[in-house]
Amino acid sequence: MFAAFAVFAPPSSAYAQTQTESTTSRRAVDVERIVSPSGIEAWLVSDSTVPMVVMRAYWRGGSAIEPANLIGVTGIMADMLTEGAGAMNANAFKERLQDLNMSLGFGAGWDGMGMSLTTLSENRDAAFEMARVALNEPRFDAEPLARIKRQMIVGLRTRETNPSYLANLALDQALYPSHPYARRTSRESIDAINRAALVERRAALFNRATLQITIVGDISAADAGRAVDTIFGALPAGVRPPEPTDVTPAAPTPLIVRQLPQPQSLVLFVGPGIQDEDPDWIPLAVANYILGGGGFSSRLMDQVREQRGLVYGIGTGPSVRDHSALIRGSAQTENGDVREAIEVTRAEMARLHRDGATQAEVNDAITYLTGSFALDLDSNVKIAGVVHGYQAAGRDIEYVNRRNDLIRAVTLDDVNRVIRRLFNPDGFTFVVVGQPEGLE
């Protein structure tokens, strides 16, 4: 995920996955497909170098399919899974996690639910039991539910002065006016969420139908299979949850301004993107590096910041949800510089769209993107994130070991085809939150 737009989706989706498609390992990652005794499939990277185990799990179905009167219920349900389970109330559960020196968390995104577990090898059986009880026997007690709802209500007030929230809301409302992606929580929806709603949401989402599991670390295939059954074996077979329709972003709005009293303005700009199964996905990683994904080597950073000093930083990257895809960019600047920063950004995008990239730029991008992938695989936690991202995106099990070659195979013609397809500034909506001078 590029820094300004960390999107959960699957743990892979959006730019998180692009980062792992934009870089490549210098060492093989031995990913093995295992099947537990009860028939649940998982991907395993067995490595005893470090005495720890990392597990990631993902289920399709997130906040985009919530009932319209219960927006926010999926996220609250995810939070409540670690607020007491089985015989342990919220305090006892958290104390047990601390005693085991483990981490366990659940999260909800637009299109799915995720679980993350990290444990020392010596505590792994007890850690797997904690995950089992959280997933299968959550208490959904009244006190932590009331506390979480109070926190969310406070958040409703603070978000109205959060530039990122306001900008992304404006974008989603402009691009997806009648789609669930434009919905947000409200005081009414939070008030309506009760224990029964949490029970229903858990039952609707947690089953084996869309479950995807990745395990990395100090554990054998046999023990990993038993761990999978310990945690997930009691889940019903279930069915894939209903999904919202695919949506094409609405026609671009050249400029949307949201006034917010502050000395700086946040600028977001988005245009139509592509899904990660598109043949142009990997060339897009190279093209994006050239436009705005390559830090100080990118064209936008050079022209908008280095040459003119108009922004503190600027970057771009793909943003993929299950039912829509975008190219997103962001910048932050002084209110007096917003107009010129947008003009220069549009002009540089237009120049790239008209003239294309150079062979030298493509070579530099490929060198960086392939060379830096090792940094994405230098710990068990990172390996789990990368491999699980590919798994959730539907990649084959060997993808992590062959993506270097895919990146290196990208040609100048490939990159310029993507640039012509996706980087036309006339297709982008710009949103400004702040008090930009001369813009309304």
Q: Where in this protein do the model-derived segments appear?
A:
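A structural supersecondary motif
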Residues: 63, 268-272, 292-333
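Bacterial N-terminal signal peptides
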Residues: 1-10
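An aromatic/glycine/proline-enriched structural segment found at the starts
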Residues: 17-18, 181-182, 207, 212-275, ...
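Scaffold signal of the M16-like zinc-metallopeptidase fold and its non-catalytic homologs
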Residues: 17, 159-207, 228, 315, ...
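C-terminal regions of mature proteins
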Residues: 17-24, 212-216, 331, 363-440
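M16/MPP (pitrilysin/insulinase) zinc-metallopeptidase core fold and M16-derived inactive scaffolds
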Residues: 55-121, 161, 180, 184, ...
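Short acidic/His-enriched helical or mixed secondary-structure segments at domain edges of catalytic enzymes
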Residues: 151-169, 250-265, 306-311, 322, ...
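M16/insulysin-pitrilysin zinc metalloprotease superfamily fold
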Residues: 83-87, 118-149, 294-295, 315, ...
